[in-house]
Design a protein with these regions (language model features):
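Short amphipathic alpha-helical interface segments
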Residues: 1-38, 70, 74-76
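A short, conserved structural fragment
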Residues: 44-55
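Accessory beta->alpha helical hairpin/"wing" motif in late/C-terminal subdomains of nucleic-acid enzymes
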Residues: 53-76
Length: 76
């Protein structure tokens, strides 16, 4: 399995969440890059974030973000 651009955008967005504070969410503004808006919508549709424009991680989203950030640290 390779990481296509859409998946890469979703992984990049998951890596933006601050895992040390569950009260830190993110907000994707309407004038953000279309790829970022699309990634947020897809993560929301998959049940990983609470709002289509960001919000907070769900329980599943937190697990995904933890794995994403761990993988990023390993590969750096």
């Amino acid at each position: 399995m390779s990481f296509n651009n859409n998946l890469t955008n979703e992984l990049n967005l998951l890596s933006q969440f601050n895992l040390s504070n569950e009260q830190d969410g993110i907000k994707i503004h309407h004038d953000a890059a279309s790829e970022l808006i699309s990634a947020a919508e897809k993560l929301h549709d998959k049940g990983l974030i609470t709002q289509k424009d960001g919000g907070y991680l769900t329980d599943l989203g937190r697990k995904a973000a933890e794995h994403t950030q761990a993988l990023s640290s390993i590969l750096k």
